Design a protein with these regions (language model features):
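Divalent cation-coordinating acidic motifs and surrounding scaffolds
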Residues: 1-183
């Protein structure tokens, strides 16, 4: 296999960036955009953090190539506490929603995957209420989102443990057009 990375340097003061690694046989990128995230906090502070990376391209399979959009994220941390840092992650979710809405304007049936370290669980405000990612497939509305990880957390499976309990911050969320597709 031959893999290639896609990376755009962002403004994160620590030099932390997000990237997308793909198999050159299975995926052909056509467009790459980095979206600046300015995390707003309750104290009035604004921090430029990691870009949200949107990679558009074609999945190559047995049939015709399938156009897909992948948004790679690493949302602001919980530094300072979950509640006091929540506005940063809510802002990140709003940016993802805005990116998706822009894609939908051009492609109403676009296929979108949202993935990365969201620093929130599927049931937290940013995922459940801002992005409106649903726990069950049947609850997903047109142009809505399904959180593929939520039910794993219900079974006690997480991606990190903190103070003796599991969290599932690393998530893959897909949109409604992908629910009926077999990729």
């Amino acid at each position: 296999r031959k893999y290639k990375p896609i990376l755009i340097e962002g403004p994160d003061r620590r030099g932390v960036d997000v990237g997308f690694l793909y198999d050159t046989v299975m995926f052909k990128p056509t467009k790459v955009n980095g979206f600046e995230l300015k995390a707003h906090y309750a104290d009035g502070g604004v921090i430029k953090t990691r870009l949200q990376l949107c990679v558009s391209g074609y999945l190559m399979g047995e049939g015709k190539p399938e156009k897909i959009h992948v948004i790679v994220n690493h949302w602001p941390s919980r530094y300072g506490g979950e509640l006091s840092s929540r506005p940063g992650r809510d802002t990140a979710a709003m940016l993802v929603k805005s990116i998706c809405d822009s894609i939908y304007l051009k492609e109403p049936k676009a296929k979108i995957i949202i993935m990365g370290d969201l620093n929130d669980d599927p049931f937290n405000h940013s995922c459940k209420d801002v992005l409106k990612a649903r726990k069950y497939r049947e609850d997903v509305e047109p142009q809505g989102y399904f959180n593929t990880m939520w039910q794993m957390l219900d079974r006690g499976i997480g991606s990190l443990a903190y103070n003796g309990s599991w969290n599932l911050f690393d998530q893959i969320i897909i949109n409604e057009p992908l629910l009926s597709e077999r990729l």
